[in-house]
Amino acid sequence: MVSQQQIEAIGGVLNNKERPLKERFRALFTLKNIGGGAAIEAISKAFDDDSALLKHELAYCLGQMQDAQALDILTKVLKDTTQEPMVRHEAAEAMGAIGHPDVLPILEEYKQDPVVEVAETCAIALDRVRWLQSGQKVDDSNPYASVDPSPPTAGDKSVTELKAIYLDAQQSLFDRYRAMFSLRNLRTEESVLAIAEGLKDSSALFRHEVAFVLGQLQEPCSIPFLQENLEDRLENEMVRHECAEALGAIATEDCIQILNRYAEDDKRVVKESCVIALDMCEYENSPEFQYADGLAKLDATK
């Protein structure tokens, strides 16, 4: 059992702007794994930080915790137009991940947001909550511990059939996401390469989710596609950030070289993402037991 004192100490690391960002990230993921009201409170305090990357990750973790106690802070962040688009988008996605019907009116309102990534995210989150309410069941063979923005497509479809839905801009983003998660769950080279084609889509939100999924898959065949979007300085920084973190998860020598080249990028979100991704590379290539090592570090300081 983790004590209140331990949670406060880990929250202290997360909220200490003097600590390296990679340490604060590890503290955040430790709090996510601990869960509960005290961890949510500690995470919520960091939304006044000046790092959009960190705040976006706070919202992501609150969504993955699937605890309705986080809905108030997430609603506040979504409504706050002084927050960066990637932070507001992640707050909306987190509300969809928690899936409580109380979020429907606020998501409906912000589905018309002038920031396209926020509006699109609210539309997908609405579809997810309504899908949950419908009581439909789907064989979700998600091999990852993530709460996804949509369930996979129902029924057994081939890669060709799924790819046709996935790349069809006339389909709703929710249905395209469903096809993407079905392709991900197949975990074949053919399905990974089909997913990688989505990095050319016209929607920045879609491209960023594609990069996230490629990071989950950790397949080296996707490296050239992720590299191309990361290196494109005209690409949306939310997408470049997600490409960097995906390369960090794949963690080959090539990935490390690419990330080192962009660790001093003039876009802060990209630069910080490369730093975090290099820390992830270090973890993936080390005998370390756990990335979210905040508790172990606390014990080591005793």
Curated annotation (Swiss-Prot):
Q: What does the record note about the cofactor?
A: Binds 2 Fe(2+) ions per subunit.
The residues bearing each HEAT-like PBS-type repeat, given as ranges, are 23-49, 54-80, 87-113, 175-201, 206-232, 239-265
Localization annotation: Endoplasmic reticulum membrane
Topology term for the membrane: Peripheral membrane protein
User: Which chemical reaction does it catalyze?
Assistant: [eIF5A protein]-deoxyhypusine + AH2 + O2 = [eIF5A protein]-hypusine + A + H2O
Family matches, as Pfam families: HEAT_2
Which annotated residues bind Fe cation 1?
56-57, 89-90
Pathway note: Protein modification; eIF5A hypusination
Kindly give the SMART domains that the UniProt entry links to this protein. EZ_HEAT
Q: Per its record, how is this protein called by name?
A: Deoxyhypusine hydroxylase
State the organism named in the record. Drosophila melanogaster
Family in the record = Belongs to the deoxyhypusine hydroxylase family.
Give the CC-aspect GO terms: endoplasmic reticulum membrane; extrinsic component of endoplasmic reticulum membrane
